[in-house]
């Protein structure tokens, strides 16, 4: 889990993203797919589609909403070691089942702080806290075999 201070940095940097969660969720997925085009192929609704087609897809909002809400759960529980352990275990098992592994989340970790910064300037130290959160996810996926 993260320290209380790290969890606070996550919450402060996440709040502006979550305040406009629908548009920001869509924008995050598009930014991920632009930075890592193969990422779209891990989503059945987007496999083989162009960015323009994904943007126009009625499925974009439902997929991005699930991602934003799951991230919100991680942010809200980041300092609770017990809850995080259970959440990470469930998350990693689900994602291994989807064929998603640690490399895909290394990609997310590399671009997510920049995405957060594009919404609102985060407090100092927030990028490192996001890196640590995604590091926990990556470690859980590796432990689950991916």
From Swiss-Prot:
- Residues bearing N-acetylserine are 1
Keyword match Acetylation: yes
Q: What terms describe the molecular function in GO for this protein?
A: heme binding; iron ion binding; oxidoreductase activity; oxygen binding; oxygen carrier activity
Q: Name one Pfam family in it.
A: Globin
Listed InterPro entries: Erythrocruorin (IPR002336), Globin (IPR000971), Globin-like_sf (IPR009050), Globin/Proto (IPR012292), Globin_lamprey/hagfish (IPR013314), Mb-like_M (IPR044399)
Keyword annotations: Acetylation, Heme, Iron, Metal-binding, Muscle protein, Oxygen transport, Transport
Sequence ranges assigned to domain Globin in this UniProt record: 1-146
Question: Where, in this chain's numbering, is heme b bound?
Answer: 95
Sorted alphabetically, the Gene Ontology cellular component annotations on this record are: extracellular region; hemoglobin complex
Q: Which domain of life is it from?
A: Eukaryota
User: What does the further note read?
Assistant: This molluscan globin lacks one of the heme-binding histidine residues found in most other globins.
Oligomeric state and interaction partners are given as: Monomer.
The cross-references to PANTHER family, in alphabetical order and at most eight, read: CYTOGLOBIN, GLOBIN FAMILY PROFILE DOMAIN-CONTAINING PROTEIN
Report the sequence similarity comment from the record.
Belongs to the globin family.
Record's protein name: Globin
Species this protein is from: Bursatella leachii (Ragged sea hare)
């Amino acid at each position: 889990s993260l320290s209380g201070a790290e969890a606070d940095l996550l919450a402060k940097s996440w709040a502006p993203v979550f305040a406009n969660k629908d548009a920001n969720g869509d924008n995050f997925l598009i930014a991920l797919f632009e930075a890592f085009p193969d990422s779209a192929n891990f989503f059945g609704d987007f496999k083989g589609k162009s960015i323009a087609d994904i943007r126009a897809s009625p499925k974009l909002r439902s997929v991005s909403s699930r991602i934003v809400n799951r991230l919100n759960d991680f942010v809200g529980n980041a300092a609770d070691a017990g809850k995080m352990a259970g959440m990470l275990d469930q998350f990693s098992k689900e994602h291994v089942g989807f064929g998603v592994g640690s490399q895909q989340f290394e990609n997310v970790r590399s671009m997510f702080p920049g995405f957060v910064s594009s919404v609102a300037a985060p407090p100092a130290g927030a990028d490192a806290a996001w890196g640590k959160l995604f590091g926990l996810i990556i470690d859980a996926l590796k432990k689950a075999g991916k």
